[in-house]
């Protein structure tokens, strides 16, 4: 969070797997309850309905403005960011993003969606919040994650933002983003998750918890028997192979350019990929894009005076 003229600038990176702010990460799962849930932890109370947030992930949808749950997830994300600073009431300027090639067509609808209520009262984890939305800045996903290190982007560079639902690809030549050379592929980490779960079911006839697969993808291992681990590892290696094949489709050549990877897919490349570490930079900070949104919005609003 940043502050400018008594307005709190709060960035929210609306991922299919996680909602990120500059200082918080929350899985996108959401379940409604008519009465207060028995167990505590990330409970949102809005318009008389209780929502448990953070169990599992949401399924891919191409237009988030068509899904009311992303509005609720946004309220939770804002509350969690404000809670870091012990703030309960604020004038809020939102900073968010959309996939590279979708932002042109979806920008205004998504802005209207996020600003649908100028003033909101709700409870998050038993704490009252009162928000007044005063504006919203929207940016292309991925690029903001590296905006503070553009000085490193000499020559030809390829940026791959590999999220849970999509992979955004952008060329950056001599510190300048090439708008005519950007693509969005529906090839996110969730594709690997689905393939891994199916492989375990096909090979062993059992279902595996998604949280177990996620631990393997993030850290390269988990407390399971070697046969299951080998099965999932093989799927993950193939997924990373397919990532590089997709990048080559867009003329990626490691000898001629540097590759920068942001998003959750970076840990899969690190854990299961074969690549030249001197030519590939993996940005581990899962909140990097949200921090970039925040910085860009702050600079833009400051210039306006």
PLM feature segments, named:
Residues 1-159, 176-191, 203, 211-305:
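Nucleotide/phosphate-binding catalytic cleft detector across ATP-hydrolyzing
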Residues 21, 169-171:
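Conserved blade-register residue in beta-propeller folds
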Residues 162-168:
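Ser/Thr-glycine-rich phosphate-binding loops at phosphate-binding pockets of nucleotides
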């Amino acid at each position: 969070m940043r502050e400018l003229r008594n307005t709190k600038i709060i960035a929210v990176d609306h991922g299919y797997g996680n909602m990120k702010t500059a200082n918080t990460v929350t899985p996108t799962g959401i379940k409604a309850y008519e009465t207060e849930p028995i167990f505590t932890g990330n409970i949102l109370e809005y318009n008389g309905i209780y929502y448990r947030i953070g169990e599992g992930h949401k399924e891919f949808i191409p237009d988030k403005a068509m899904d009311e749950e992303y509005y609720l997830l946004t309220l939770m994300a804002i509350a969690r960011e404000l809670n870091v600073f012990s703030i309960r009431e604020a004038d809020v300027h939102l900073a968010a993003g959309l996939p590279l090639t979708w932002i042109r067509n979806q920008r205004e609808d998504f802005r209207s969606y996020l600003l649908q209520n100028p003033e909101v009262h709700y409870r998050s984890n038993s704490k009252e919040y009162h928000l007044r939305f005063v504006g919203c800045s929207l940016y292309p996903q991925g690029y903001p994650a590296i905006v503070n290190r553009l000085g490193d982007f000499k020559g030809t560079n390829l940026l791959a933002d590999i999220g849970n639902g999509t992979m955004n690809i952008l060329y950056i030549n001599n510190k300048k983003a090439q708008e005519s050379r950007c693509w969005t592929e529906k090839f996110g980490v969730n594709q690997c998750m689905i393939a891994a779960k199916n492989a375990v079911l096909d090979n062993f006839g059992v279902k595996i918890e998604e949280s177990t697969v996620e631990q393997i993808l993030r850290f390269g291992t988990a407390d399971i028997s070697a046969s299951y681990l080998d099965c999932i590892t093989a799927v993950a290696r193939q997924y990373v192979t397919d990532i590089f094949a997709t990048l080559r489709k867009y003329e990626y050549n490691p000898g001629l350019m540097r590759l920068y990877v942001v998003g959750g897919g970076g840990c899969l490349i690190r854990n299961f990929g074969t690549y030249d570490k001197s030519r590939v930079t993996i940005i581990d900070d899962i909140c990097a894009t949200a921090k970039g949104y925040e910085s860009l919005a702050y600079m833009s609003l400051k210039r306006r005076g």
